[in-house]
Structure formats: C-alpha cells, structure tokens
Amino acid sequence: MDSIFFGKLNIEVAAASGIEAVVKRELVRLGYEPSGANLGRIEFEGTFEDVLRANVFLRSANRVRIVLAKFKAETFDELFDGIFSMRWQDVLTRDARIIVDAKSVKSKLFALSAVQSVVKKAIISKLSTVYNGTFDESGAPYCIEAAIVDDVVTVTLDTSGEGLHKRGYRTYLGEAPIRETLAAAMIQLSVWNPERVLIDPFCGSGTIPVEASLIGLDIAPGMNRNFACEQFANAPKVREKVQDEAEQRIKRDRQLRISGFDINKDAIKLALKHAERAGVKDNIHFQVQDMRDLSSKYAHGVIITNPPYGERLMKEDELKALYRDFGRVTAKLDEWCVYAITSYRGFEKYFGRRADKVRKLYNSELECNFYQYLASPPPKRDGQTR
C-alpha cells in the first residue's frame, strides 16, 4: 500500500463567493499556478508540504482540500461503484475515523443524508476487502466530502479541520463580528498597502485592524493553530519546515499606521485583547471614539470598515442617521478612500454618494455589498509604493 501524501496532489481551495479572485492572487504570490476561480473553488497542483503551506499562509480562503476523484453519478449504484473503485487504502489508515459530508447542486442525487450513507458504506466495503476484517475507527479523523454538481461527483479530503477563519486570536466575540477571512479579503481588495494610513472607525472587536497588521507585518494567519492534516499518520511531517518559513517572512521592524476606533469601550477592550493574542498590539492604535469625531492629520489614507447594520443592532431610523453622519465626516477627508461593507441596501442613498465600485460579498451566510469610494493616490515618496 502506498500513501498518496508522498506524491503529487490535486489541491482544492474553498473560498466564499465573491473573493475567489483574491484567493487566486494569494496562491500566485505563494508561487503556485492555480486554475479557475469560480463557484467558490480554486485548484492547483502541489505536494503535501504545499497543502500545509496553503493552510498556514492563505488569508482569505475558507479551507484546503485534496481532490481524490471526479466521476459522473446519476444513481446511488453509480455513486457506490465510483467510490468503491477508489484506492482508499492509499488515503486512509486502517484505524481512520471516517467522517463523510455531502453537497448537491442541480443533481439527481440530492438527498444529502442518503449520499453520505452510500459514500461511507462504499468506503467501508472497499477497506473491508483490502484489510480482510473490521476496524474500529479509533485513529485520526479523515473528513471526506462528496460534492455533486450537475451530476458530477468531486470527492475530496479536508486538510484544514476548523475553518481557516479560526486564526486563534479571537476568543471573544463582539456584536456583529466580521469573519477574519472576509476582513483579509476586504483589505486586499482595497488600495491599502503597509506604507499607507488605515483607519477603521467602527472597529468593534478589532478584526479589520488586526488582519491589516498581520498583512503589513507579513505574519502568516495560520502560524498559531493546528490543522487536520497534521494528524494524518500516513503523511510526511512538514510542519516544522513550513513554520520556519513563516517565521523568516515576518517583518517586525516595519512601521504601520493603523488605527481602530469604536464608541463602545467594551469593544475596544476586546480589540486590545485580540491584538495582543495576535502579536500585533504594538502595531495598532485603538481608542474609544465616536465615528462623528473622526479626523486625521494625514491628507491621504484608507478607511476600511464594517459599520453597524441590521435590526438586532439598531433601528432603521438610527441606521439612516448614522450613515448620513458617516458620509458627512468622510466627505471632509476628500483625499481618503472609503471601503464599507453592509447588508443595508440603502447605504449609498444615506451615505450621500454613489460608490465607484460595488462588490457582492458574504459575511458568513449574510449577503452584503462592499462599497468602494476611491480617491487620488498620495504623492509618491522616494522608495515608497502607493
């Protein structure tokens, strides 16, 4: 029996709708040649070390999987046969704890519990013939996904475990938190770079300033957590090598100008805790401040924020007034770029300006718009990028 983890692998990166291109650019910067960037999935070829690198370094991706097989199945018999034909002995250890997940889109096989049952039965049947006996599934978990789209089954093995938004620094949640992966994507969709000023006037528990600091200092988001693939007994041990690479990339001496403000003092306390846990507390200025008091000594800068929205946080009349005030305050910062994400469809009307660009993004399952207001770039200083 040969383990697949010592050869070339087809690796799939899952991303939220709307940010596939961001993840693709991240993969290119890591040295890979990804193919496609749609339907929330991007693929590239690599080794098991590349699987772990993707988990450690990707900022905007949801998770990383290994593609095991693709085949057409319109009946449960075809599904069983396709799964049974695979060399599961090269993927799973004899004591593997097998977990099966399923998804179905525009396919004849749409009963997910039945799909899960058939897939698990086929895997067990195959391994029983190989090992000539039973097994207790007492080892490391191996999560298999059967995703059926247009009657084509893609079988993958999850390597991440918990979603990649779980960085390890955010243990306390404020009101209406934004996912770390989405915050990182918003920053990368903006014109901000480490040479520029960044302010989040509704910073809440600090996710956007923290993610910007991680980007600015080149700190890998997955440095301080573990991944499911590290438990695979039949895979090479490469964490130390990847961790060393991540350590060497860090630019601790880089000076950043990142600020987070919020009217809620408890939110600022959370933000400080999260920044400390992320190792970037000294790189962010947090302060209790009403958005209406926002000003800056800098003529040029970037505002990236997740303002309040939704009935749970405030009444609609209060929301409209808040957005009006936000528009008035930022209008005074006329050489600043403004990026705001909200699910409220009337944002542009009450903000007082039509956005230069609007992009549909999802905060967890909530559909939002990412409004982008651009400005002229700052004068370029010697050796400085804009």
Task: Describe the role of every protein-language-model region.
Residues 2-140, 386:
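Non-catalytic nucleic-acid substrate-recognition regions in nucleic-acid-modifying enzymes
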Residues 49-56, 162-165, 379-381:
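Short, charged/polar, Gly/Pro-enriched secondary-structure boundary elements
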Residues 105-108, 163, 308-312:
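A short, flexible beta-alpha/helix-coil linker loop
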Residues 136-150:
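Glycine/charge-rich, flexible interdomain linkers and switch-proximal surface loops
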Residues 155-189:
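SAM-dependent Rossmann-like transferase core, predominantly class I methyltransferases
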Residues 178-295, 311-312, 316-318:
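Conserved S-adenosyl-L-methionine
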Residues 287-293, 297-386:
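C-terminal catalytic and target-recognition region of SAM-dependent MTase-like enzymes
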